[in-house]
Curated annotation (Swiss-Prot):
Protein name: Beta-ketoacyl-[acyl-carrier-protein] synthase III
InterPro entries documented for this protein: ACP_syn_III_C, ACP_syn_III_N, FabH, Thiolase-like
Organism: Prochlorococcus marinus (strain MIT 9515)
First-level EC class: transferase
EC number of this enzyme: 2.3.1.180
Subunit structure: Homodimer.
Residue ranges that the Swiss-Prot or TrEMBL entry lists as coiled coil: none
Function statement: Catalyzes the condensation reaction of fatty acid synthesis by the addition to an acyl acceptor of two carbons from malonyl-ACP. Catalyzes the first condensation reaction which initiates fatty acid synthesis and may therefore play a role in governing the total rate of fatty acid production. Possesses both acetoacetyl-ACP synthase and acetyl transacylase activities. Its substrate specificity determines the biosynthesis of branched-chain and/or straight-chain of fatty acids.
Record field: catalytic activity: malonyl-[ACP] + acetyl-CoA + H(+) = 3-oxobutanoyl-[ACP] + CO2 + CoA
Record remark: domains: The last Arg residue of the ACP-binding site is essential for the weak association between ACP/AcpP and FabH.
Pathway assigned in UniProt: Lipid metabolism; fatty acid biosynthesis
């Protein structure tokens, strides 16, 4: 544990939570709609099923339930929460869904806002929250990753509809003068490769009056160049984690767990191989939930903590990566 000077501020990770919808969509059921099979999907992605939000479920509701579970694990009074950051690319309200979660929680003293960085979103939000805490601005923060990608999937495209699901996860973080359990982090973006994975707007051109033009509409469906995204992930993710190891004087042998964005089992295995991290250290629940974007990391984290796989003071190397293109890594000590 890294002990800090009394005039410095570190962070401690106090609780986790998660929520997934009750509707389960299996590979077999998808194969009734598009030309695919359970064996084909599992062999290429590692996914067996995914959760799909019901008509009454949305990002705010899922995020609220995950956040509440994290608060309960941390044993916090709701009134003591200062900051809520929601990582999402599929907000229930385009102007922001975090305030709705704040209201549902009754966290009246907290400022709440959304952060959009797709599948890197939760990691970026955790890093953002810790900087507020370490600066002394706030004491307690809830970071939530919640996404409802099923609303933006082309369910007739067998290349992409097999990948995505819905869910939410959360983390309770607290400032402390005793130690710092955020050992190090790094974040990157490359907009030049943004077209490899995006969700473009779908606009209709119109006029208010003559010569005053405008466009209206919403969004299309997820567009992805799977081959390029795979090459990006298996190259950049090991590099950013390895550079973080060097910066923090860590290595693959010193970590207990590798927690990656749950995008594709082949990516998880390839990153582990390139970092010389044994498969026993790679956390994965991809088979049950698929790619839930900003929710994948906290979903897996909460599952591993509640199953007592991750224990106090375990070292976790984690990385989020995806649309933007964006990617990042962090080394954390649980507790």
């Amino acid at each position: 544990m890294e002990v800090i000077n009394s005039n410095q501020i570190g962070v401690s990770f106090k609780g986790s939570g998660s929520y997934v919808p009750h509707q389960i969509l299996t590979n077999h059921e998808i194969s009734k709609k598009v030309d695919t099979s359970d064996e084909w999907i599992k062999s290429r992605t590692g996914i067996s099923q995914r959760r799909i939000s019901g008509l009454s479920e949305n990002v705010s509701e899922m995020g609220y339930k995950a956040g509440l579970a994290a608060i309960e694990m941390a044993k916090w009074d709701i009134e003591t929460i200062d900051l809520i950051i929601l990582a999402t690319s599929t907000p229930h309200d385009l102007f922001g869904s975090a305030p709705e979660i704040q209201s549902k929680l009754g966290a009246n003293n907290a400022v709440a806002f959304d952060l959009t960085a797709a599948c890197s979103g939760f990691l970026f939000a955790v890093i953002t929250a810790t900087q507020f805490l370490k600066a002394g601005s706030y004491r307690r923060a809830i970071v939530i990753g919640s996404d409802q990608l099923s609303s933006y999937v082309d369910w007739n495209d067998r290349r992409s509809c097999i990948l995505f699901g819905d869910g939410a996860g959360a983390l309770a973080i607290e400032a402390t003068n005793e130690f710092d359990n955020l050992i190090g982090f790094s974040m990157r973006t490359d907009g030049q490769r943004g077209s490899f994975l995006n969700l473009p707007s779908q606009k209709n051109n119109d006029q208010i009056i003559d010569n005053i033009n405008f466009s209206s509409g919403g969004f299309s469906t997820i567009a992805m160049n799977g081959q390029e995204v795979y090459k990006f992930a298996v190259r950049e993710v090991p590099l950013i984690i390895d550079n973080l190891f060097k910066k923090t004087n860590f290595n693959s042998e010193k970590i207990n767990w590798l927690l990656l964005h749950q995008a594709n089992q082949r990516i998880l295995d390839s990153v582990g191989d390139r970092l010389n991290i044994s498969s026993e250290k790679i956390l994965s629940n991809l088979s049950n939930y698929g790619n839930t974007s900003a929710a994948t990391i906290p979903l897996m984290l909460d599952e591993a903590i509640r199953n007592k796989k991750i224990k106090e003071n375990d070292i976790i190397a984690t990385s989020g990566f995806g649309a933007g293109l964006s990617w990042g890594a962090a080394l954390i000590r649980w507790g």
